[in-house]
Amino acid sequence: MATGATIEVLYFAQVAEHMGLRHETQPLDAPIQAGDWLDALAVRCPALGPAARLKLAINQEHVGRTATIRPGDEVAVFEPVTGG
């Protein structure tokens, strides 16, 4: 996990391709709702498409849009996976 007023962000599969990177450290001075953070990410990279379809995990636990991201967290962003 990151320390201080940052979060460690991991991007997987198509999300990483659209972002052009697999990992970055982002500043985060105060807690933020995951949905708000995802919305900001979609604005930053419109190629991701609607933020509502993206999935995330905080500190290796799958969470929904109402979860809270806090400084020091590790956030993983990925697309839904289906099988069949």
Predicted ranges, named:
Residues M1-G83:
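Ubiquitin-like/PB1-type beta-grasp interaction modules and other compact soluble beta-rich domains
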